[in-house]
Design a protein with these regions (language model features):
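Non-heme di-metal
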Residues: 1-135
Length: 135
C-alpha cells in the first residue's frame, strides 16, 4: 500500500506468524480459499479499518475498506471457478468462446480449450476464456 512507502520508508518490519497449510482437491482448495476471502471482507479488513479510523488513520481505514471490496470479488471468482469445475465447464462451453493462453497470449475460438497451446506447447490448464471478447 502506497501509504506504507511514505510512512515506513527506511523502517524494518518484523513478522512472526503461523499459517495453516491445507492441501486438498481442487474443489476443496477453492472452497477453503472462498471461505478465507469471505472472512477477510466480512470481518478482518472491516475490523482493521475500524481500528485505524479510531486511531485517526483515515487514509489507512479507507484503503483497508477498499481491500475488503477486492476480497469480496476474490470470493466470487473462486466460487465461480468451483461452479465451473463441478459443472465440467472449466475448459468446455456449449457455444464457441474465445480462449486465451495465459502463457503466450495465443487466441483460439471454439467449444473447448486446446489440449496444448499450439504456439508455446503449454497444457490446457493455461487457458481461460478471454473476457475481453465477451459482450
Amino acid at each position: 500500500m502506497k501509504f506504507m512507502n511514505k510512512d515506513l520508508a527506511g523502517e524494518t518490519l518484523y513478522t512472526d506468524g503461523n499459517f495453516p497449510v491445507l492441501l486438498g482437491t481442487t474443489a476443496e482448495n477453492l472452497k477453503a480459499a472462498a471461505a478465507g476471502e469471505n472472512e477477510e471482507y466480512t470481518d478482518m479488513y472491516p475490523s482493521f479499518a475500524k481500528t485505524a479510523r479510531e486511531e485517526g488513520f483515515e487514509e489507512i481505514a479507507t484503503a483497508l475498506e477498499s481491500i475488503a471490496i477486492a476480497e469480496k470479488h476474490h470470493e466470487a471468482r473462486y466460487l465461480k471457478l468451483l461452479e465451473a469445475l463441478e459443472n465440467g465447464t472449466t475448459f468446455k462451453r456449449e457455444s464457441p468462446v474465445v480462449w486465451k493462453c495465459n502463457n503466450c497470449g495465443f487466441i483460439y475460438e471454439g467449444l473447448e480449450a486446446p489440449e496444448r497451446c499450439p504456439a508455446c506447447d503449454h497444457p490446457k490448464a493455461h487457458f481461460e476464456v478471454n473476457t475481453f471478447f465477451l459482450g
